[in-house]
Amino acid sequence: MDEFAKLFIELVEACHAHERYRDLECINLIASEGLKSPAVREMLRLCMDLESRYSEGENDLQGRVKERYYQGQKYITVIENCAADLVKKLFNCNWTDIRVVSGTHANLATFKGISNVTKNRKMVVAPLSCGAHISHDYTGLAGQVLGLEIINLAYDVEELNIDVDKSSEIIRAARPGLVTLGASLFLFPHPVKELKSVVEDVGAYLVYDGAHVLGLIAGGAFQDPLREGADFVTASTHKTFPGPQGGLILANLTDERMEKAIKGVQHAVFPLSTSNVHLARLPAGEDLAKQTVRNAQAAGQYLYEHGIKVLGEKKGFTRSHQLAIDVREYGGGKKVAKDLEEANIIVNKNLLPYDDQNNRENPSGIRLGFQDVTRRGFRESDIEHLCDLMLSVIKGKRKPAEVREDVIALRKQFNTIKYGFNSIEEAMKYLEEAN
């Protein structure tokens, strides 16, 4: 057998092994991952031909297709327009761009478009160690790709949130073109309403990165940033909003100021950063959103009561799907995440607000997300069982390899994906009966 054939066989075997490992044998607590329903998986199989097609073109100020540059687009255009209209109805806005392929791409287009319109290269954001996504930071997309000057908001470590008074002073002094809220470590709603007036006073646009909490927003279980004053919401479609990998941008076209910005963002999407639109990746309900938050809060309470330093105890630990846990006492984030991985409990190491943001390799904390286990049907009592398994690993009471068998056994009890439809037919029947 030649080397090419060996590599191909290894590739196929690794794909099968991954499916068994992560889908059947692990409990996934990565906060940035989601779980697709059977109906969504069926929809992806239904539209396989879309993956082979190009559909570049311009959109209008409602986010619908304006002009195509390729032929054979009549049904692709219907699909894109329907998807855009569904997004606008779900989030109660009058403009969206669904062509971006990730949350980071949504940030790229929004930051680029607005900075071009304002001719202002300054952006004020939360510090990286306090939860900001790498794409907001001077070390990431905003600084290294777009060349923006990054200025940090003030952060209250006790409240685990942005300090409104000090941040208002920073915004007034900096006079940026962009102020970005939202985060990658995102436990509590950010002060959108509280900062809106000062952002307007300096002529800036307020962007809210809702990648982690989009499904919670859709389900009414978190803040509603557009209603609170955000000019743009950027997001990904595969975290608490449990669809395939993708991105979107939301806004309301209300005046000439917003029209200029939307046109700038659309230009940054196409032609600046997108050629083809990957429609094959396009897709939460209220019950799912609320149960996800309840599960996260239950885990926070249980772990805290058993001696683990869970951040945010005075505020109920979290109002999102996430928990932040200080594990320095047990060897730090890198060690604990690795130990839990050996037990088939998948989490990630994470900087905490008081960490040196250059210490990403071994931060103080780990981040947990409960959207995946909630989708599988975990309730509060199941979460406590899971926490017991985590505690036995974190505190070194049992070897991870021993705990692994219990984790696999627990995972096998939850084989049905909840809060969704089992087929396209079931979804269509439900919608027909509801109307």
Where does each model-flagged region fall?
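N-terminal glycine-rich, Lys/His-bearing helix-loop that initiates the first secondary-structure elements
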Residues: 1-82, 197, 419-435
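Short acidic (Asp/Glu) and glycine-rich catalytic loops that position anionic groups and cofactors
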Residues: 19-25, 52-53, 62-63, 176, ...
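Conserved PLP-enzyme active-site core in the AAT-like
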Residues: 75-78, 82-309, 327, 370-371
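Glycine-enriched alpha-helix->loop->beta-strand junction motifs that scaffold or abut catalytic
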Residues: 229-231, 344-345, 364-366
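Short, conserved charged micro-motifs
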Residues: 257, 330-337, 376-381
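Conserved small-domain helix->loop->beta segment predominantly found in fold-type I
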Residues: 284, 289, 293-338, 346-362, ...
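PLP-dependent enzyme catalytic core of the Aspartate aminotransferase-like
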Residues: 294, 298, 359-435
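A common structural junction motif
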Residues: 343-347, 394
